[in-house]
Amino acid sequence: MRAAARIEAALARLWWRPQPSLGARLLQPLSWLYRIGAALHRLPYRLGWRAAQRAPVPVIVVGNLVAGGAGKTPTVIALVQALQAAGRRPGVISRGYGRQGSELRAVDPASTAAAVGDEPLLIHRRTGAPVWVGRRRGAAALALCGAHPEVDVIVADDGLQHHALARDLQVVVFDDRGAGNGLLLPAGPLRQPVTRHPPVNTHVLYNAPAATIGWPGATAVRGLRGAVRLRDWWGGAGASPGALHALRGRPVTAAAGMAAPQRFFTMLRSAGLTIEPLPLPDHYGFATPPWPAAARDVLLTEKDAVKLPPDADADADARPRLWVVGLDFRLPDDFVAALLDNLRRVQRPQCR
């Protein structure tokens, strides 16, 4: 195991427990320094010394209070689809974590994950919405509006702790791990403290069967849509439940390059599959195949699939067969209705 992976595993053992352990308490002085640094970062905006940039249209920020994944990207995709179904014309901005370079760039069907980031590419592929990536979110919002004047709401992929771009609404996502031991980084997983009540204009979504902290919120509807061969997925084919069910009773390798891969593995086991789990680092690049040479069938998340070319699975009889597993992640109707109601109160025109 690499040194970084060992450190990550050790921190996870400290973070994801109901109460702080002795090891977490020993790290807590560093958490106090982190809290001071975060407060100093926010101070110029709170005192009016620095003004947050306001986009021409409403901005909805989607993010986590905890380090690592809690289901932010599926939430962004589901939110964009819900806005589209309601007649809105959303666009998406993202930093494009893990990509090469930091320049402003539009995501299009010919983009690669290396150039724009795996999550922005997946969001664009799943929703068809215009997506721009850039280190400075304000500049990305202006570039998006300039290129797509029809956009009437911007969804910011991540950025809860970034204050240079003003937000009108925010969606905070928690998974079944909640706030862990309740401490700030590095003693715990929190990027900012969990207050007694959620901030104003905050909608809370639980990527879990029930609420996992004290904030009121909605629970997402989640499941597996099925599986499709990688080459067919790139061709636009949808995931089939039958293809996934056909893998039952066969030895299958399940690979997942995400912050919480066990969630994917658990869903596959719940679907009746016998899997050999292969957890990978978040944003894993797939420069070389990580699965065993003897593997016959490999299941991948869509986030990982965007980093593999179609010809990685070009031969119908190739070994291993690469399957993309689609996630069915939906927002509750009352959650969408409440968010749309708040969005209607924000009086700003389209980008044009």
Residue ranges and their predicted role:
Residues L33, T73, I123, D157, ...:
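A residue-level signal for conserved active-site and pocket-lining positions in enzyme catalytic cores
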Residues R2-P58:
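A transmembrane-helix-recognition feature enriched in membrane-embedded lipid enzymes
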Residues V80, Q84, H124, R269:
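Gly/Ala-rich phosphate-binding loop of Rossmann-like dinucleotide-binding domains
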Residues M1-A12, A85-R88, L160-R352:
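ATP-dependent carboxylate-amine ligase
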Residues G96-W215:
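Phosphate/Mg2+-binding loops and adjacent switch elements
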Residues R42-P109, P349:
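Walker A (P-loop) phosphate-binding motif
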Residues V59, G91, P130, D152-V155, ...:
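Residue-level preference for the first positions of well-ordered beta-strands
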